[in-house]
Regions:
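Rossmann-fold NAD(P)-binding glycine/threonine-rich loop
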Residues: 39, 73-110
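NAD(P)-binding Rossmann-fold cofactor-contacting core
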Residues: 22-46
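Short acidic-hydrophobic, aromatic-tinged amphipathic segments that line or gate anion-handling sites
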Residues: 49-56, 90
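Glycine-rich adenosine-cofactor-binding loop
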Residues: 1-17
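Short, well-ordered alpha-helices that flank and scaffold nucleotide-derived cofactor binding pockets
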Residues: 17-21, 81
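Short active-site oxyanion
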Residues: 2, 26-29, 62-66
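Rossmann-like NAD(P)-binding element
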Residues: 56-76
Length: 110
């Protein structure tokens, strides 16, 4: 599954770490308008491409999922207008739900 992560702050960084551990997920890029964002630093350590602009990336037709954790309604709307029909978007609350479920599972495994 090819995933693009938009937003590399605290939430994006946490999700990136979790997603990177899953062998069925290919993170094709991490985007943040702040080139010093923590998630971009982590992505570089994982050798994942990093970007400061998402506009061209969301139009790629080989993406399965775009995860938007920017908490910016305009970004979410823009992604929705420009993404291919077969690409799904997960917004901040959906991404947080997934993160919480994964964290709970990890706690039970310990």
């Amino acid at each position: 599954m090819k995933v693009l992560l938009i937003g590399a702050g605290k939430g994006g960084s946490a999700l990136l770490t979790i997603l990177h551990e899953d062998k069925e997920i290919e993170i094709v890029g991490v985007v943040d308008n702040n080139p010093q964002a923590e998630g971009l630093k982590i992505a570089r350590q994982y050798n994942i491409p990093t970007y400061t602009h998402y506009e061209k990336l969301v139009k790629k037709d080989d993406l399965d999922v775009i995860i938007d954790v920017t908490r910016n309604p305009q970004v979410h709307t823009d992604i929705g207008k420009n993404k291919p029909a077969n690409t799904e978007i997960l917004g901040g609350l959906s991404a947080k739900l997934i993160w919480n479920l994964v964290e709970e599972r990890k706690k039970k495994e310990e």
